[in-house]
């Protein structure tokens, strides 16, 4: 009798173990996400929204990627204008992952690569402008940066939707002289209005 019970327990345990392994490998990919799948270490495919089954011990989810637009605020970068004025510029990048495979395998650290590319692109663009131009040409700089970054990040599976210069900070002495000039203009304008 004991042998009969033992002979029944082992198959039941094995069946439960197999069912547990199978259940643990069923995956649901939610909306706005993609899973990059590797089989035995090689790229197998990209799973989109829905129910999927991962082959146990052979396949693995290499990366779980958000397909939503993402916003990255980079710290202020020191840049030098054409007239040799050093200032700090704070940038914000709005981007979206368009190709999960390229995003996973195209570059080692995508965020670091975007940050470095943003800094060098900003330095190149501002380096061609004088201080006055850089302070008054935000839309032009934003558009130029977006076009350059979008083209460069295509190989990484990334689309740059927008670039914004959040803050342009000239050196303290130049900022003070600009404020004095603005006050003088306002004073002159109010004096001229009083004379009328």
Language model feature labels by segment:
Residues 1-182:
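N-terminal hydrophobic membrane-entry segments
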Residues 188-196:
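Single conserved hydrophobic/aromatic residue that forms the stacking wall/gate
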């Amino acid at each position: 009798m004991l042998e009969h019970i033992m002979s029944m327990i082992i198959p039941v345990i094995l069946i439960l173990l197999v069912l547990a392994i199978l259940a643990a490998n069923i995956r649901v990919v939610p909306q706005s996400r993609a899973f990059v799948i590797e089989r035995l270490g090689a790229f197998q495919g990209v799973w989109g929204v829905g129910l999927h089954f991962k082959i146990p011990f052979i396949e693995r989810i290499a990366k779980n990627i958000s397909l939503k637009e993402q916003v990255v605020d980079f710290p202020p970068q020191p840049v030098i204008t054409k007239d040799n004025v050093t200032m700090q510029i704070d940038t914000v990048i709005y981007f979206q992952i368009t190709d999960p495979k390229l995003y996973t395998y195209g570059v080692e650290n995508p965020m670091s690569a975007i940050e470095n590319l943003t800094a060098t692109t900003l330095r190149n663009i501002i380096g061609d402008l004088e201080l006055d131009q850089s302070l008054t040409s935000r839309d032009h700089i934003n558009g130029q940066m977006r076009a350059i970054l979008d083209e460069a990040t295509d190989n990484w599976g990334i689309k740059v939707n927008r670039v914004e210069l959040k803050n342009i900070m000239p050196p303290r002495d130049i900022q003070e002289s600009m404020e004095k000039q603005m006050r003088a203009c306002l004073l002159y304008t109010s004096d001229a209005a009083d004379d009328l």
